[in-house]
């Protein structure tokens, strides 16, 4: 009978190690919650907590005081529920597909009702069960994605019976430009939200996403639902595609701590002569004798093909440029600047960490941090740690 991998064996066998700092996650939640109090602060944990593992991340937010958790799909909520205590509430942002209403009610999960059809379906179930059912009601205030349109809202107000069957816990909307403090769309959406609320019986409301929590008290209402800021990304800087600045100037503006590091293992080091081509298509040609190293991660692991011949890894303070095309399972680095013998089979290089932020990698990929974060695949060895005061405690 074979024995299961130990944690050390899993780490060694994987192409890379994704280290997630649960203490930093709790810090980020607490920092936002404290700053916007007495507004309640929820945590958005959709897409498996932005790829970091909802079953580990959501309990960390719970320990920091969070009791409200937003996911995108009902299946995500059902899967996460066993990892949270009974006083936690799960909300489904995308609402419900027809035929799933009974399961949602049975599990005690609250849907966000985004259309008149979803409202009608939820109210119909309430009628069959003979009781009001709790839900959130979303309005479209300018994003044109989810939420009741102005016409649907008018029709809803005309149907008193329909409204009477639903226990509306929050009226919500979503900011399209919350990460751009000077964008006039924010004020227009706030005005629309305020006008809609004035036409309803007094209800708790929610508007602010991560960026919205930095726009001022008028955006807070009764519940905020930050997402990307909890995961270490300053919402005002996530779209910064300018050249890298000095490392000391990269500190987040809003007391948000980075929550992850990513390292990859070297699987081969070789010397090549001038004129040697590297990778598929031979898109990189050595302009002289050089030393190259291949690492065991690729676009299947969230390091996109757009990093080909740009971007880098680090070993200590030394930048190691990516050369050639990114493959599915490997990336090649120029390591000529390191002394011979520094890197060998099994050595680790930094892809995300103190020398290179997640935002830097996203910029090199011509994308946003969300896309990189949620694409980090399940082939990494995942290590969850608590880092406090310079010390590290590792958890399985």
Curated annotation (Swiss-Prot):
Sorted UniProt keywords: Isomerase, Pyridoxal phosphate
Domain of life: Bacteria
NCBIfam families in UniProt: alr
Biological role: Catalyzes the interconversion of L-alanine and D-alanine. May also act on other amino acids.
SUPFAM superfamilies reported for this sequence: Alanine racemase C-terminal domain-like, PLP-binding barrel
Classification of source organism: Bacteria, Pseudomonadati, Pseudomonadota, Alphaproteobacteria, Hyphomicrobiales
Protein name in UniProt: Alanine racemase
Family stated for the protein in its record: Belongs to the alanine racemase family.
Organism (species): Brucella abortus (strain 2308)
InterPro entries for this protein: Ala_racemase, Ala_racemase/Decarboxylase_C, Ala_racemase_C, Ala_racemase_N, Ala_racemase_pyridoxalP-BS, PLP-binding_barrel
